[in-house]
Amino acid sequence: MARDRPPLLVVDVAASGRDDPAFQAVLDALSERVVATAALVGLDAVRVPAAETGPEALLAALADSDAVVLTGGEDVDPARYGGDDAHEGRGRTFPDADAAQVALVLEAVRTRTPLVGLCRGMQLVNVALGGDLVQHLTGHVRPGDPRRSMVDHDVALDPDSDTARVLGTTDPVVRSSHHQAVARPGTGLRVVGRAPDGTAEALEHESAPLWCVQWHPEDEGARGDGLAALLRAARDATRGPGRA
């Protein structure tokens, strides 16, 4: 019997283990806005923490879902992309979450399960597919209180990109909060959007239904309906050809 609302898997980094309650609260609020927006566009969203779930259970959850969102959070472990473990800008990592999410990304691409990556989610997708990261950069996060860390800036999207089509613009004004970014794109990926300083801001895959953005369309101060547009694209792609 068909389900009335396609199930959406929202994968967070972790549900616990953080030293900063304010940062945890920010991440929870962002993910809850993904869940709420998903409901508005006709998706039934469930949040799952990757670190506590593990690869096997996360893949089982993916198999029961029609689309997936990877949310923001901590750094990707530099060991996964040849980064410097002693880098002065190295942040907190959750290696167990990385392992589970890498397995999920590979399976989602293989099965052509629609995937949306937000902030760290975009970085994780890139690393999972063999790319690497700029390990530390400045100017894309406001230091101090995580509740006030967002930075507003322009993005230039390739006019022929699917991301521009989905968002209905080639020049969105977005909200970012990150100190890492995509450097070399992974296999099958291409950068389709950049910030004024050249930082990669959007990724697409050559064949899989995948939309990754470095910014936070789920932030309460975000302009427009970018998050809803991305989730609608994922929803609509669940009905497309080529699904395994």
What are these regions (language model features)?
Residues 199-204:
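Short, surface-exposed beta-strand/loop micro-motifs that present aromatic residues
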Residues 117, 121, 126, 130:
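Gly/Ala-rich beta-loop-alpha elbow adjacent to hydrolase catalytic centers
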Residues 188, 206-210:
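Beta-strand-turn-beta hairpins that frame and shape the catalytic cleft
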Residues 164-174:
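Catalytic cores of DNA base-excision repair glycosylases
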Residues 1-113, 127, 134, 138-151, ...:
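N-terminal beta1-alpha1 cap of cysteine-dependent amidohydrolase-like domains
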